[in-house]
């Protein structure tokens, strides 16, 4: 299935449903156990590592998620460069694992793609995540 928005298209497995969360387009598997969210990001912020550090700081000084644990904030070797923020948190009796990738897509556009799965399913879902990321196209 291919999800399209004004600024991008991305492929996800058949049967996933589309939802929105603010400005983000969310695509959720039928069981509600895996999700990918895509949102436009500020292209004028070239230091994506600093961007994630600020986001984490804001999260920790606000009403952050229960059980927040940073896994890493690191450079991402994706497209025109970017950074990943990976973390875990607890919600609804589940330990969740998230990777948020901020990157420049060209044509003055930048995006954040977030991938969320239960922590105990993280490793076996990485192939799907790589396939989804490879399918991303900026418009």
What is each stretch, according to the model?
Residues 18-127, 134:
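Conserved polar/disulfide-associated segments of primarily extracytoplasmic proteins
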Residues 5-24:
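Proline-anchored loop/turn motifs at beta-strand termini and strand-loop-strand connectors
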